[in-house]
Swiss-Prot record:
<comment type="similarity">
    <text>Belongs to the bacterial ribosomal protein bL21 family.</text>
</comment>
<dbReference type="InterPro" id="IPR001787">
    <property type="entry name" value="Ribosomal_bL21"/>
</dbReference>
<dbReference type="GO" id="GO:0006412">
    <property type="term" value="P:translation"/>
</dbReference>
<keyword id="KW-0699">rRNA-binding</keyword>
<dbReference type="GO" id="GO:0003735">
    <property type="term" value="F:structural constituent of ribosome"/>
</dbReference>
<keyword id="KW-0687">Ribonucleoprotein</keyword>
<keyword id="KW-0694">RNA-binding</keyword>
<dbReference type="GO" id="GO:0005840">
    <property type="term" value="C:ribosome"/>
</dbReference>
<protein>
    <recommendedName>
        <fullName>Large ribosomal subunit protein bL21</fullName>
    </recommendedName>
</protein>
<keyword id="KW-0689">Ribosomal protein</keyword>
<dbReference type="GO" id="GO:0005737">
    <property type="term" value="C:cytoplasm"/>
</dbReference>
<dbReference type="Pfam" id="PF00829">
    <property type="entry name" value="Ribosomal_L21p"/>
</dbReference>
<comment type="subunit">
    <text>Part of the 50S ribosomal subunit. Contacts protein L20.</text>
</comment>
<comment type="function">
    <text>This protein binds to 23S rRNA in the presence of protein L20.</text>
</comment>
<dbReference type="InterPro" id="IPR018258">
    <property type="entry name" value="Ribosomal_bL21_CS"/>
</dbReference>
<dbReference type="InterPro" id="IPR036164">
    <property type="entry name" value="bL21-like_sf"/>
</dbReference>
<dbReference type="InterPro" id="IPR028909">
    <property type="entry name" value="bL21-like"/>
</dbReference>
Length: 96
């Protein structure tokens, strides 16, 4: 059984036991969360409604990216760095 969930503006195909990296979620490491389900599928490919639960197993920040802006002939240069936060979630159950 697998499901399609949506979080952080993106959709993920998940099955029980998967560990996925999603945009930062509120919650402490080890806490249980319920993820919004777009669709759930049984083994035969039948579409059913369902519920997905997961556990937060980690949180970190991605590698820094550099954003560089400039305007030619105007002596304007600007450098900015950005690190995106993410959360690792272990999928527990896909319930129908």
């Amino acid at each position: 059984m697998h499901a399609i969930i949506e979080t952080g503006g993106k959709q993920y195909r998940v099955a029980p036991g998967d560990v996925i990296r999603v945009e930062k979620l509120a919650g402490d490491i080890g806490s249980e969360i319920e993820l919004p389900v777009k669709a759930a599928f049984k083994e035969g490919g039948e579409l059913v409604s369902g519920k997905v639960t997961g556990t937060i197993v980690g949180a970190d920040r991605a590698a820094k990216i550099i954003v560089f802006k400039f305007k030619r002939k105007k002596q304007y240069k600007k450098t900015i760095g950005h690190r995106q936060s993410f959360t690792d979630v272990k999928i527990g159950d896909v319930l129908v």
